Regions:
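Short, N-terminal intrinsically disordered low-complexity segments that are rich in Pro/Gly
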Residues: 2, 17-26, 191-195
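Generic N-terminal amphipathic, Lys/Arg-enriched alpha-helix
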Residues: 8-21, 181-187
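Short glycine-rich or small-residue beta-strand-to-loop segments that form or flank ligand, phosphate
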Residues: 14-22, 32, 50, 59-64
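Alpha-helical support elements that line or immediately flank enzyme active sites
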Residues: 26-42
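Catalytic-core signal marking the mid-to-C-terminal active-site face
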Residues: 45-47, 51-201
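Active-site helix-to-loop segments that bind/position phosphate- or nucleotide-bearing substrates
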Residues: 198-202, 209-214
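Conserved small/polar residues in nucleotide/adenosyl-binding loops
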Residues: 225
């Protein structure tokens, strides 16, 4: 495999193995909500999340990281707007205080976030609109979890991102991926170039597995199997 193609494959591997705090779809919603709040310039009074059917399916019953056990799209959006730091991207909810969790619960009870169905053929596609008084902001994400396709402030478009599926979000072009090249990369890549990424992945996955065995999560299938 030539060095140029190998570099692209290494870049793709790095992009696909980005650590995320929790299930990726709700984290993406929290990221968009945090970004929208930054554009708005203040804490929003109301949030509307327009989500594709696939997003709704993948988030509606998922526990949101650092939420204290709360679930769903509304929680992800409200917590992201209150406590999220968009510069941390997929670790946007890394730092959440008890006060912010309590505030999120209160806003959920007040129904400050509404979820709407977004009719889209793109599985990962959603928009988060936030508003306060007469001001509003909107962040649209397509294709990948942090690929911002559009940002609006008070109805005016202030940013247009990459809407191409293969390159969206500044990612390496996936069109270079073929079965033949993937096998060649796996056979020939020097281990020292992939070892740090793979070892981190193994460590994280083992930590998750041990936590699943020791804690009470979901239906408890892992415990019953072990």
């Amino acid at each position: 495999m030539n060095s140029n193609l190998q570099e692209k494959y290494l870049a793709i591997l790095q992009e696909e193995l980005v650590p995320a705090m929790g299930c990726t779809e709700p984290i993406a919603l929290a990221y968009a909500s945090a970004k929208a709040r930054e554009i708005l310039g203040c804490e929003p009074e109301y949030i509307v999340a327009k989500c594709s059917g696939n997003m709704i399916k993948n988030v509606r019953c998922v526990t949101i990281p650092n939420s204290g056990g709360m679930t769903g799209i509304e929680t992800a959006c409200i917590l992201g707007a209150i406590a999220g730091h968009s510069e941390n991207k997929m670790e946007v909810l890394e730092k959440v205080t008890e006060e912010q969790r309590a505030q999120t619960k209160k806003l959920l009870e007040q129904k400050r976030c509404e979820v709407e169905f977004l009719d889209s053929d793109i599985p990962l596609h959603f928009m988060v609109e936030v508003s306060a008084g007469a001001d509003s902001a909107m962040v649209e994400i397509r294709y990948s979890h942090t690929n911002i396709a559009k940002i609006e402030k008070n109805g005016e478009t202030i940013f247009i991102g990459d809407e191409n599926e293969a390159t969206g979000g500044g990612l390496t072009d996936r069109s270079v991926l073929t079965l033949e090249n993937i096998k060649q990369f796996a056979d020939e890549v020097p281990l020292n170039l992939v070892r740090p990424m793979i070892e981190r992945q193994i460590r994280y996955n083992m930590d998750i597995a041990y936590e699943g065995i020791s804690g009470d999560y979901g239906l408890g299938d892992r415990k019953s199997v072990v």
